[in-house]
């Protein structure tokens, strides 16, 4: 109820709105009656004050300060009984109230302030009672509708009929879930604004790009935002009845989304359980794999590629639980985005690793650009929306479904390889590890022990030994060719022979022994990693 509604109450029949008419839409939630000098300290937002102005009769200039303070506090207005202690409202006071759009009501002398307060409060209570009755009726109506199995779209249509406006249901990432009408709204452009809407409160905003006004109510489950009820028009904040109806619809939708989410979780659990058993090779036969795979629309003779994704642990202060919740949110978002994937995808989770199993073509070169582009775009979205980074490992193409466990191993190895190099937000394509990569997987202490035991005194940092070590390294690189070694070192052939004999003496082994040369080659490769 606003000031203009108050003026229609019978108790205000002979009252006049003499100032601040531009503030006629100010909401009135309560009425107060007081004549104390410190009255302003007891007033609240949206409160209407009625007074005889007794405390102002000798200090009429204080009225201007009272108006300023009330306007600052967001009070609804001021009702003054004139012709008793205050004969008239001064012109400068009226001008001041007009400048603040702060309503001043001139009350007739013959009506008691108590009657005005009681009549106004009764009217407010009647309106609140009607609104609550309307909300209860709406909630019952919407609940019965959902319980009868008619679905969300039909419910949105009912809400739309009440509001006489289109109604859209968006998920927490601003993607359209359902709508009452076929309507084109670029929800992606609204994502940034919707993310700033906090708490389960009704909000209105306008966008500069399309010059449209939107009304939105976030939908919550377990104190977690699970979507938005969006109306592409202005719903007046003063229309409490309509807002209560929208809130009841949001409550019912929240329960329906909770039910749908429970069904999705059951489906995900069954899917993930199958995949885990499959890649761990716990099924007893190929026929069992074929039959179970059919449930998840996986074809036996189809070629597949596996992508393993994992949230990067950028901040070590994040707890395991926080990281797991963030990981769940990111991969739930990824699952929703897979409808735009360039090849038919199947999504699974194994622990905190998200797995995309792609129905592949014959050649990786045909798929490379579009797959990498999708993953890079997703990484950008995660960075913007979740303030985290995610990395991916990609396998080679496998020829049949039975080979998928090997493809998963390749994707996991590629992901681990990227993390070992301390990279973040990477996309690593699997390739067979060469010697340095295999050596990196070993503990540094083990590398040092092998290096020292193989090279013995040659491993020490002495000048003479260093020249011997360098000669030995070049000799092994040139496939034990003495002439080529001398040529590369710019020394005489006899010098090379002397140094190699010295090496054999220090090592106590022959350089013609294949086992010895293999160990020496490995030790020299390790030298670069250790240093």
Swiss-Prot record:
InterPro entries: CdaR-like_regulators (IPR051448), CdaR_GGDEF (IPR041522), PucR_C-HTH_dom (IPR025736), PucR_C-HTH_sf (IPR042070), PucR_dom (IPR012914). GO terms for molecular function: DNA binding; DNA-binding transcription factor activity. GO terms for biological process: positive regulation of DNA-templated transcription; purine nucleobase metabolic process. Keywords: Activator, DNA-binding, Purine metabolism, Repressor, Transcription, Transcription regulation. The keyword Repressor applies. Belongs to the CdaR family. Activates the expression of pucFG, pucH, pucI, pucJKLM and guaD, while it represses pucABCDE and its own expression. This is Purine catabolism regulatory protein.
């Amino acid at each position: 109820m606003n000031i203009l509604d108050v003026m229609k109450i019978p108790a205000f029949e002979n009252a006049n709105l003499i100032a601040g008419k531009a503030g006629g839409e100010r909401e009135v939630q309560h009425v107060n009656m007081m004549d104390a000098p410190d009255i302003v300290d007891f007033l609240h937002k949206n409160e209407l004050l009625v007074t005889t102005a007794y405390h102002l009769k000798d200090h009429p200039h204080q009225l201007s300060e009272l108006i300023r303070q009330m306007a600052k506090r967001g009070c609804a207005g001021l009702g003054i009984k004139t012709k008793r202690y205050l004969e008239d409202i001064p012109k400068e006071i009226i001008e001041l109230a007009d400048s603040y759009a702060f309503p001043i009501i001139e009350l007739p002398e013959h009506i008691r302030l108590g009657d005005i307060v009681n009549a106004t409060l009764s009217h407010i209570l009647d309106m609140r009672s009607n609104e609550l009755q309307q909300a209860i009726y709406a909630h019952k109506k919407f609940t019965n509708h959902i319980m009868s199995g008619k679905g969300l779209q039909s419910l949105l249509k009912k809400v739309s009929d009440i509001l006489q406006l289109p109604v859209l249901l968006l998920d927490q990432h601003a993607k359209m879930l359902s709508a009452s009408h076929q309507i084109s709204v670029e929800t992606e452009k609204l994502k940034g604004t919707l993310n700033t809407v906090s708490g389960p409160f009704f909000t209105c905003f306008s966008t500069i790009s399309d010059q449209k006004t939107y009304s939105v109510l976030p939908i919550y489950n377990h104190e977690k935002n699970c979507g938005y009820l969006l109306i592409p028009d202005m719903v007046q904040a003063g229309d409490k009845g309509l807002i209560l109806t929208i809130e009841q619809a949001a409550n019912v939708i929240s329960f329906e989304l909770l039910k749908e989410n429970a069904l999705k979780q059951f489906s995900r659990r069954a899917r993930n359980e199958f995949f885990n058993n499959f890649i761990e090779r716990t099924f007893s036969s190929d026929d069992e794999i074929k039959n179970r795979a059919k449930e998840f629309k996986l074809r036996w003779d189809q070629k597949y590629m596996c992508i393993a994704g994992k949230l990067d642990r950028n901040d070590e202060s994040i707890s395991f639980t926080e990281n797991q919740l963030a990981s769940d949110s990111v991969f739930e978002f990824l699952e929703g985005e897979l409808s735009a994937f360039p090849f038919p995808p199947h999504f699974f989770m194994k622990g905190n690793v998200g797995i995309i199993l792609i129905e592949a073509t014959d050649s990786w070169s045909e798929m490379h650009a579009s797959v990498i582009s999708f993953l890079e775009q997703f990484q950008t979205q995660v960075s913007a929306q979740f303030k985290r980074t995610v990395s991916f490992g990609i396998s080679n193409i496998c020829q049949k479904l039975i080979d998928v466990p090997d493809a998963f191993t390749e994707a996991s190895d590629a992901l681990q390889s990227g993390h070992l190099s301390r990279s973040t937000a990477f996309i690593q394509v699997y390739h067979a590890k060469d010697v340095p990569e295999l050596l990196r997987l070993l503990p540094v202490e083990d590398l040092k022990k092998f290096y020292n035991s193989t090279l013995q005194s040659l491993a020490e940092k002495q000048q003479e030994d260093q020249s011997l070590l360098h000669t030995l390294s070049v000799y092994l690189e040139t496939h034990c060719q003495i002439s080529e070694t001398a040529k590369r070192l710019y020394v005489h052939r006899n010098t090379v022979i002397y140094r190699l004999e010295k090496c054999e003496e220090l090592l106590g082994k022959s350089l013609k022994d294949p086992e010895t040369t293999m160990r020496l080659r490995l030790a020299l490769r390790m030298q670069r990693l250790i240093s």
